[in-house]
Amino acid sequence: MRAIDTNVLARYYLQDDHAQARIASAVLAGGDLFVPRTVILELEWVLRFVAEQPPEKVFACLAHLLGLPGVTVEDSDKFETALKFCQHGLDFSDALHLAASGACRELLTFDRQFAARSRRRALKPSVRLPTV
């Protein structure tokens, strides 16, 4: 098994460098790859903020990656759950925080929008503002 870095996946999804995109496609087609969770986090950031892709396209790329044969994504179950939460209006990082907190009864945050969106959609665990 070989691990793969963010820039290889970015070339594959963005197709912005023909030579590197061709190589990236061949690497992914060869399978037996491992994608660390940190690569997924960086890929989402690169696609959204560097390449200025709309969230829907970013989420589609991540969902595609999670379904590729021969590609093992670290904590793939949490990323799949996070992408489902994104369909409820959460941004990716908040969705991932919530997905990773699945065994907890609640997630505490000072982010009022995150708490409100999660509450309106009855997402679990519950998200609330901390109090004394």
Where are these regions (language model features)?
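Acidic, PIN/NYN-like endoribonuclease modules and their adjacent C-terminal/linker elements
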Residues: 1, 99, 103-132
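Alpha-helix/helix-capping structural signal
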Residues: 7-8, 38, 112-113
